[in-house]
A protein has these predicted regions:
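Radical SAM [4Fe-4S] cluster-binding motif and immediate context
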Residues: 142, 147-188
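Glycine-rich beta-alpha loop elements in corrinoid/cobalamin-binding modules
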Residues: 3-140
Length: 188
């Protein structure tokens, strides 16, 4: 959200923070009629992502659903096949700038091959085939904006359940690295 133009009206739904079940999420998605729904996940999340994205698409068929994260980056073509028909597009690699370019270039919902071909790291379907654009690495990771605290205020998160000192402060997990932080060996 931080990389998107400020003119974009962005909502962040954190199901854990808001103690939201799937039924509440689907109702909110249907009621708010989002233009774009962004999901992210690891390889372990791919089955729940497929199931959720299919339900999201049924509740909000006009919404464009995109998927990023480690799973989409490791196996983009297989991921696109697996999450069909719920997910419309995937992003591989560093998605911040690519997502911003996607939003800017498709505001008028022009998803022509020529428009999509110019978006780095985008994976999409064209004429029955899956197309993967080359990724564009972010040369300076310090250029990535900090999170949009206005749409995810730290005080809105529950207090940490861990540690004697930290129990009095709100807690939300945030990754400060690229890629997967876990030491598994089955993905890569």
């Amino acid at each position: 959200a931080a990389s998107l133009p400020r003119s974009c009206n962005v909502s962040l739904i954190d199901m854990l923070r808001d103690n939201m079940d799937e039924e509440c999420l689907l109702k909110e998605i249907k009621d708010k009629r989002f233009d774009l729904i962004c999901l992210s996940g690891y390889s372990k999340d791919i089955v729940p992502i497929r199931n959720l994205s299919s339900k999201l698409k049924k509740h909000s068929p006009e919404s464009i659903i995109v998927l990023g994260g480690v799973q989409a980056s490791l196996m983009p073509e297989a991921t696109m096949e697996f999450v069909e028909p719920g997910v419309d597009f995937c992003f591989t690699g560093d998605g911040e700038n690519s997502l911003a370019k996607f939003v800017t270039n498709t505001e008028c919902r022009d998803f022509s091959h020529d428009i999509l071909k110019g978006i780095p790291g985008l994976v999409f379907r064209s004429n029955g085939k899956i197309v993967k654009n080359p990724e564009e690495l972010i040369a300076d990771l310090d250029s990535i904006p900090f999170p949009r605290w206005d749409i995810m205020p730290p005080a809105s998160y529950p207090k940490s359940p861990h540690g004697a000192f930290f129990r009095q402060f709100p807690y939300a997990a945030m990754y400060a690295t690229r890629g997967c932080p876990f030491p598994c060996t089955f993905c890569a």
